[in-house]
Amino acid sequence: MQAPRREDARRQGEGLATLSEAAPRSSGDGGADGIAPLAQEADRLAQEGGRGQPAAPGTATLEPPERGGGGDPSAVLSIRPRQEVAGRGRPSADAAAGQPVPPTLWYKDAVIYEVHVRTFFDGNGDGTGDFRGLTAKLDYLQELGVTALWLLPFYPSPLADDGYDVADYTAVHPAYGTLGDFKRFLAEAHRRGMRVITDLVLNHTSTQHPWFQRARRARPGSRWRDFYVWSDSPDRYRGVRVIFPDYEADNWTWDPVARAYYWHRFYAHQPDLNYDNPMVRRAMLKVVDFWLRLGLDGFRLDALPYLFEREGTACAGLPETHAFVRELRAYIEARYGERVLLAEANEPAAELARYLQGDECHMAFHFPLMPRLFLALAREEAAPILQVLRDEPAIAPACQWALFLRNHDELTLEMVSPQEREELWQAYAADPQARVNLGIRRRLAPLLGNDRRRLELAYALLFSLPGTPVIYYGDEIGMGDNIYLPDRHAVRTPMQWSGGRNAGFSTANPQRLCAPVVVDPPYHYEAVNVEAQLASPDSLLNWLRRLIAVRKRFPAFGRGDLELIAGDNRRVLAFVRRLGDQAILVVANLSRFVQGVRLDLAAYAGCLPEDAFGGATLPPIERRPYFLTLGPHGFYWFVLKRPEGEIPEPR
Ligand SMILES: OC[C@H]1O[C@H](O[C@H]2O[C@H](CO)[C@@H](O)[C@H](O)[C@H]2O)[C@H](O)[C@@H](O)[C@@H]1O
Ligand SMILES: [Ca+2]
């Protein structure tokens, strides 16, 4: 491992815009220390909520807590029901008639694209991506086939954790534009039929958030103090793991102003909110109101397991946390109808399934599957994937896994055994510079050796296994990374739009860019960029567009069951996705060599496999094993068709 980076962590905001540069909206709002009192903050939210309207009946109210501030987490919040059930921020005809709008389960058929406003496209030429820039690129995303966007945090923040350190939940970071710019972006996305979800950083704030600044000065035991988790000694919750071990030694940090320790699961500049305090829960519901009234389609719930702490536990996924998620879901559903909650919970599958029982989240990222896709590619055998699929716990019919290969963080190896982690590090991060915490800070293409066949295979699995695929911006063109940037900025470099100035990301002076563009020779923006790939019919980008278009023809991929198909070659993975009379056979060769496989497809005897891409039909399936050959890292998607159109019942 590289030398510990704890000091780096405290400096990591350097070179990036700071909140003070970005004109903090809270200063001057009143209060002796320049910080708005919470009640005033609540009033502001009420005034600004959604479209400049006062808080609607039925939304959360910030009432003074009962004395002592603690409270029973299972207690029902003070919420008055409201009759409105809106679609896209406006009551629909049904809602206006008082009828709930039936859920569409749109997220099951979605193709989600994770995008960082900061590094996607600079619309005003100041070197930093912004909402004007993102809006200008919506046509590109639509043509790619994307149907939903997930935006990383774009709120006012000192950016010491790239926005996951929120200083104001209900505004836009000035570097990214205005709330008006956000509204225009949302309207334009909706006009193209795209949904938008954003990160909701529930667990913690920045130390610069007015709530923390007030808490640290407040009297111990007071309602303001109790917005965060304090202790006189760092001995509470001993043994709870540190999530960023390269940067932090402990989950407690001494605050000289409060003269107490505060709890933080992530960086020391990210104090955990105290969800035992009903005021915190209400405050977060007001944040939810603010964005949903604007018409947002849902939230990625960041760091969801860590909301509550209890002595003697791992302080993760506690019953109290699930109780709060249920309240959050019920609150949203009663007021806004179908808005999606996507859990970011880096936990084993059995734990994840607890969020997916129908009354908490709609989706959860499949953290156990992701590293096993990479393990299967490294070992060139199907077993690691099969193991996850066989052990997969049941989830409610309306729920869905969110599948991903890469995201804005390190490729986290928290969900594999220490031996598997070592194996993955050896296979994908031989250079210690590529490692961070318990993971690997590399993008998809460098991880897979820029090998086009392996990239296509990885995408073919992402788009055919049960769940909704999530693409990380830039991975559609096989962008590289910069492991010499601090922390996870390695994988957050500017989008490469062209071979021109600043990769087409910005017209600014190159020295003013929010992050350097990639110039590593194999991934240099002059070679790897959208413009060049759009012009090349065989580019990765055009190939992926075709793959997405094919997936969209078959609802079985988003909504169907999974049937594993037995074969006689451990290097080949085979399964059928079924929905009604639609059945798609997926066969994937994990090895770099040609493979043959005999598949037990007796249940489909009589069916004709038709290639979903080219339409060629193979000989009919018989009761005896069906023989297929696959090229290196080859894969097939076959539509199983009976001559008379009937597909047999599942076994
Ligand atoms: O807001 C703090 C962090 O929350 C998310 O972290 C998640 O990613 C971590 C890896 O970087 C992972 O170890 C942890 O279990 C997750 O909660 C968010 O995605 C991070 O960017 C952020 O720093
Ligand atoms: Ca800009």
What does each of the following model-derived ranges do?
Residues 45, 62-66, 74:
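A generic structured-segment signal
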Residues 30, 71-74, 80:
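Compositionally biased, low-complexity intrinsically disordered regions
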Residues 40-41, 47:
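Compositionally biased, intrinsically disordered low-complexity segments enriched
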Residues 54, 64-67, 100:
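Cationic, low-complexity basic patches in intrinsically disordered or flexible, solvent-exposed regions
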Residues 2-6, 12, 16-21, 25, ...:
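Active-site and adjacent substrate-binding regions of carbohydrate-active enzymes
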